């Protein structure tokens, strides 16, 4: 019997009204999925601010722009999954799109489709210290219940000085999240000056060798600090999958054809 930990993943990255670090988290997770040898399809559904896609315009690891809340494009999204059968589907959802996203999930029967295709849905929410992200997650949890798995990413950018996650930690939403076996992780801070250089040059993390040395080592440090956090949610984030390599026997057999 296949457990939820062994199932392939559709990972929807959420972030309230935006400004949480959602796209940065998409970029770090996509980097580690590809570096880990996971067969991953990546989409940017934030059509008004498609930074996830734009950072990967020149990279060999492309990101497809798709308007998930537009029915024809959502049809194409599910068709592509059925045809290509990746291990992980990563989709950066637009900020403040919760109601439209829930409507589309219901319209397509996404949980049923996912199960039929061998996938489990992960709702991955990037937190700041504002109420809007907590409220957005609460509505998604109430709608999806145990049909999905949950990850909360607490961005350390919002956990400095007088800033903290007290609102989240004392919320009823967190209690519900824990009852649903959600996993909390943190995202380290990427040095602002390095973030700006990467942004201005439009580089993905796969293209870090194009950065000035000082910025490259700060990005490498950010990624080194990110790895154990992401690995703490390995099953929910699909990091356990690796594209199998053909056996030597199969290679010899194919060579003889």
Q: Which functions belong to the PLM regions below?
A:
Residues 3-12, 25-26, 35-104, 108, ...:
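Nucleotide-state-sensitive switch-loop elements of NTP-binding domains
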Residues 104-130:
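Inter-motif core of Ras-like GTPase G domains
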Residues 135, 209-257:
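C-terminal accessory extensions appended to soluble enzyme cores
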